[in-house]
Amino acid sequence: MKRTVYIESSVVSYYTGRPSRDVVIAGRQQSTQDFWPLLSQDLVPHISALVVKESGKGDSEMARKRLDAIASFGVLATTPEAERLAQAILDARGIPQEYPEDALHVAISAISGMEFIVTWNFSHINNPFTKIMIRQTVENAGYECPEIVPPDAFLGDEP
Protein backbone atom coordinates (compact mmCIF):
# COMPACT_ATOMS: atom_id res chain seq x y z
CA MET A 1 0.00 0.00 0.00
CA LYS A 2 1.31 3.43 -0.94
CA ARG A 3 1.82 5.84 1.95
CA THR A 4 0.49 9.40 1.93
CA VAL A 5 3.03 12.18 2.34
CA TYR A 6 2.82 15.95 2.59
CA ILE A 7 5.79 17.57 0.88
CA GLU A 8 6.70 20.81 2.66
CA SER A 9 8.30 23.65 0.69
CA SER A 10 11.86 23.13 1.92
CA VAL A 11 11.97 19.71 0.24
CA VAL A 12 10.94 21.20 -3.10
CA SER A 13 13.64 23.85 -2.76
CA TYR A 14 16.36 21.31 -2.04
CA TYR A 15 15.20 19.16 -4.95
CA THR A 16 15.31 21.95 -7.52
CA GLY A 17 18.08 24.12 -6.07
CA ARG A 18 21.34 24.89 -7.78
CA PRO A 19 24.13 22.59 -6.55
CA SER A 20 25.70 23.90 -3.36
CA ARG A 21 29.31 23.82 -2.24
CA ASP A 22 28.19 23.72 1.40
CA VAL A 23 28.60 20.09 2.45
CA VAL A 24 25.41 19.99 4.57
CA ILE A 25 23.25 21.58 1.89
CA ALA A 26 24.82 19.40 -0.82
CA GLY A 27 24.08 16.30 1.27
CA ARG A 28 20.45 17.33 1.69
CA GLN A 29 20.17 18.05 -2.01
CA GLN A 30 21.50 14.58 -2.82
CA SER A 31 19.20 12.90 -0.29
CA THR A 32 16.26 14.77 -1.79
CA GLN A 33 17.29 13.73 -5.31
CA ASP A 34 17.44 10.11 -4.12
CA PHE A 35 14.06 10.44 -2.39
CA TRP A 36 12.18 12.09 -5.27
CA PRO A 37 11.64 8.94 -7.43
CA LEU A 38 9.86 7.32 -4.47
CA LEU A 39 7.12 9.93 -4.84
CA SER A 40 5.91 8.24 -8.00
CA GLN A 41 6.75 4.67 -7.01
CA ASP A 42 5.99 4.04 -3.35
CA LEU A 43 4.32 7.18 -2.01
CA VAL A 44 1.32 9.38 -2.74
CA PRO A 45 2.60 12.97 -2.61
CA HIS A 46 0.48 15.92 -1.57
CA ILE A 47 1.09 19.63 -1.16
CA SER A 48 -1.10 22.60 -0.30
CA ALA A 49 -1.79 25.97 -1.89
CA LEU A 50 0.73 27.29 0.65
CA VAL A 51 3.47 25.11 -0.89
CA VAL A 52 2.47 26.35 -4.35
CA LYS A 53 2.62 29.96 -3.13
CA GLU A 54 6.01 29.52 -1.44
CA SER A 55 7.40 27.61 -4.43
CA GLY A 56 6.37 30.40 -6.79
CA LYS A 57 8.40 33.07 -4.99
CA GLY A 58 11.87 34.34 -5.86
CA ASP A 59 13.88 33.98 -9.04
CA SER A 60 11.43 33.29 -11.88
CA GLU A 61 13.52 30.49 -13.44
CA MET A 62 13.91 28.67 -10.12
CA ALA A 63 10.26 29.28 -9.24
CA ARG A 64 9.24 27.64 -12.53
CA LYS A 65 11.44 24.62 -11.72
CA ARG A 66 9.86 24.29 -8.28
CA LEU A 67 6.32 24.61 -9.63
CA ASP A 68 7.02 22.09 -12.41
CA ALA A 69 8.40 19.62 -9.86
CA ILE A 70 5.15 19.62 -7.85
CA ALA A 71 2.66 20.01 -10.71
CA SER A 72 1.41 16.41 -10.50
CA PHE A 73 0.99 16.30 -6.71
CA GLY A 74 -2.40 16.33 -5.04
CA VAL A 75 -3.30 19.71 -3.53
CA LEU A 76 -4.87 19.64 -0.06
CA ALA A 77 -7.40 22.26 0.95
CA THR A 78 -6.68 25.01 3.45
CA THR A 79 -9.87 24.86 5.49
CA PRO A 80 -11.08 26.94 8.43
CA GLU A 81 -10.54 23.78 10.48
CA ALA A 82 -6.87 23.70 9.42
CA GLU A 83 -6.50 27.40 10.22
CA ARG A 84 -7.91 26.81 13.73
CA LEU A 85 -5.53 23.90 14.31
CA ALA A 86 -2.59 25.99 13.06
CA GLN A 87 -3.52 28.71 15.55
CA ALA A 88 -3.73 26.12 18.33
CA ILE A 89 -0.21 24.92 17.44
CA LEU A 90 1.04 28.51 17.60
CA ASP A 91 -0.80 29.18 20.88
CA ALA A 92 0.74 26.04 22.43
CA ARG A 93 4.19 27.26 21.36
CA GLY A 94 4.65 24.16 19.20
CA ILE A 95 5.85 26.55 16.50
CA PRO A 96 6.88 30.16 17.16
CA GLN A 97 4.20 32.81 16.52
CA GLU A 98 6.44 34.41 13.88
CA TYR A 99 6.07 31.35 11.62
CA PRO A 100 2.34 30.79 11.07
CA GLU A 101 2.98 29.20 7.67
CA ASP A 102 4.92 26.38 9.33
CA ALA A 103 2.00 25.69 11.67
CA LEU A 104 -0.35 25.72 8.70
CA HIS A 105 1.73 23.09 6.87
CA VAL A 106 1.36 20.80 9.88
CA ALA A 107 -2.33 21.54 10.36
CA ILE A 108 -3.28 20.98 6.73
CA SER A 109 -1.49 17.64 6.67
CA ALA A 110 -3.04 16.50 9.96
CA ILE A 111 -6.59 17.55 9.03
CA SER A 112 -6.18 15.78 5.68
CA GLY A 113 -5.01 12.52 7.26
CA MET A 114 -1.50 12.45 5.83
CA GLU A 115 0.75 9.74 7.28
CA PHE A 116 3.96 11.77 6.96
CA ILE A 117 5.15 15.36 6.68
CA VAL A 118 8.42 15.44 4.76
CA THR A 119 10.51 18.50 5.58
CA TRP A 120 14.04 19.81 5.92
CA ASN A 121 12.79 22.51 8.32
CA PHE A 122 14.61 21.53 11.50
CA SER A 123 14.16 24.97 13.04
CA HIS A 124 10.41 25.04 13.54
CA ILE A 125 8.88 21.74 12.45
CA ASN A 126 11.24 18.77 12.57
CA ASN A 127 13.15 19.02 15.80
CA PRO A 128 12.67 16.99 18.98
CA PHE A 129 11.29 19.89 21.02
CA THR A 130 8.74 21.23 18.56
CA LYS A 131 7.64 17.75 17.50
CA ILE A 132 6.53 16.95 21.05
CA MET A 133 4.40 20.10 21.32
CA ILE A 134 3.06 19.72 17.79
CA ARG A 135 2.04 16.10 18.39
CA GLN A 136 0.35 16.91 21.72
CA THR A 137 -1.59 19.82 20.23
CA VAL A 138 -2.72 17.91 17.14
CA GLU A 139 -3.79 14.88 19.17
CA ASN A 140 -5.53 17.03 21.80
CA ALA A 141 -7.55 18.53 18.94
CA GLY A 142 -8.69 15.02 18.00
CA TYR A 143 -6.46 14.34 15.00
CA GLU A 144 -3.69 11.88 14.36
CA CYS A 145 -0.38 13.68 13.97
CA PRO A 146 1.59 12.73 10.86
CA GLU A 147 5.14 11.53 11.44
CA ILE A 148 7.49 14.44 10.76
CA VAL A 149 10.60 13.27 8.91
CA PRO A 150 13.30 14.43 6.50
CA PRO A 151 13.41 12.90 2.99
CA ASP A 152 16.31 10.60 3.82
CA ALA A 153 14.14 8.76 6.36
CA PHE A 154 12.54 7.02 3.35
CA LEU A 155 15.81 5.80 1.87
CA GLY A 156 16.01 2.66 4.01
CA ASP A 157 14.04 -0.55 3.65
CA GLU A 158 10.43 -0.66 4.78
CA PRO A 159 9.76 -3.54 7.19
In which residue ranges do the predicted regions lie?
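Short, C-terminally biased terminal segments at protein or domain edges
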Residues: 142-159
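General small-molecule cofactor/ligand-binding pocket signal
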Residues: 46, 76-77, 147-149
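A residue-level structural signature of the nucleotidyltransferase/glycosyltransferase Rossmann-like core
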Residues: 4, 44, 117, 146-147
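Residues at the C-termini of beta-strands that transition into short coil/loop
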Residues: 49, 79, 152
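Active-site neighborhoods of divalent-metal-dependent phosphate/nucleic-acid chemistry enzymes
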Residues: 73-130, 155
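An acidic/histidine-cluster motif and surrounding catalytic segment
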Residues: 68
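C-terminal end-helix/capping segment
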Residues: 126-147
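Short, well-structured N-terminal submotif of metal-dependent ribonuclease cores
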Residues: 1-47, 54-65, 91-97, 131-134, ...
